Amino acid sequence: LIRGQEGAKAGENYHDLDIWGGGLNANLSWFLGKTAVGFDISKERIYSTALGTSLAENDYKDISGSDRKYDHKGERTNTNIMLEHNFIFGGFTLSAGVLANKNTGLDHDFRFYPGVDISYRPNDNWKIYASWNKALRMPTYTDLYISNVVQQGDITLNPEKNSTFKIGTRYRQTGFSAVLSGFYAHGTDMIDWVQTSETEQKDSKYHVMNIGKLNNMGYNLDATIYMQELI
C-alpha cells in the first residue's frame, strides 16, 4: 500500500471468489474386500481488479461499497473420479486406489494419480504401515496473474507434482500411545518466488517460476499419555 493514497492509487485490490460443487460416493462390501467409487466436480470463479484475464469494458462488474469495478475474471473447473479397494487378510490390510483428475485451468485431459497403503497388525498393540501416492497442486490465481512493483506472476506455470513415501509404526496400550514415522517426498515443477541474474536484468521484482526438483525427508516421533484411561 502507498501511504497518503486511497483506492487504486494506494495499491488496493478487490477480489470476489466463488467456489461451488458437489459429489457422489458409493461403496460395496464383498468377499474380496470393500470397493469404493466416487465422483466430484467443483468450479472456481474469481472477479478481481488484478487477478485473471482482462474483461471487456461492458463486462465489468460493480464492487459493493466502492466506486471501482472488477475488470478481471478467472475460472476453472476441477473434476475427480476415484476408485479404491480395501482388502483385509488376517493382520494385513491393503488399500490401493487411483484418482483421475481433470482441471480446465490446465487443459481438458484426465491425469491419473495412484496410491497404495499397506499395514500389518501382529497383535492388538502394534501396527506397522507404509504408503506411497502421487499428487498434483495447481498454481493459485496469485501465482498466475499477480503483477505489481515487487511480484510478477506467470500464466504459463505448470502444476506441482509430488510422489510421497511414508513408513512407520504405532504402539497402543491402555493409557499410552507412540508413533514413529518417516517420509520422503520427491517434487517436480515446484513453484517458488525467486530473483535470478536473468530476471534482475529486466527488473527488481520477484518472479514466480517452476524451479525444478525438490526432495524432502524427515521423521516424526510422537507419544501421548491418556490420563483418563489411567485413572
PLM ranges: what are they?
Residues 1-111, 119-121, 179-180:
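Face-selective signature of the C-terminal outer-membrane beta-barrel domain
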Residues 2-12, 52-61, 113-115, 145-152, ...:
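Flexible, surface-exposed loop regions and adjacent strand-edge segments
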Residues 21, 80, 113, 152, ...:
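Short beta-strand-initiation
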Residues 45, 85-91, 136-140, 190-193:
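Short hydrophobic/aromatic-rich motifs at helix boundaries and adjacent loops
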Residues 95, 129-131:
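Structural detector of well-ordered beta-strand residues that form the stable sheet scaffold
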Residues 107, 121, 127, 134-188, ...:
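Outer-membrane beta-barrel signature, preferentially recognizing the C-terminal barrel domain
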